[in-house]
Amino acid sequence: MFSRSTGCTEGNCENGYGTWTYTDLTTYVGEWRDGKKHGKGTVMWPNGYIYEGEFQDSKWHGEGTLTFPDGATYVGEWRDSNMNGQGTFSLADGTVKKGIWKNGELVEPN
């Protein structure tokens, strides 16, 4: 999900709240600090993926929700853009995987 930069299309993308649009039309709307995504924000990809949650130094970090194009969702904790900590992955077919995640893998189901 790597996108090449285009630029700040609205607001303050250095220190504040702004919108950044990438060449592939991926869009980030949210808080910025020192030119990096930091705080609460939303990334929307043209292919239907949406991440809404917390960022630290432009990485998904803290509480957040990733929604997949097929309707599946992961709701929970993130660290360095990976599922890390307590979280729930709900697949489009109704299957639910819940528990402790480490680097994107479910390590302690509950």
Show where each model-derived region lies.
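Glycine/tyrosine- and acidic-biased, solvent-exposed loop/turn segments at the edges of beta-strands
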Residues: 1-110
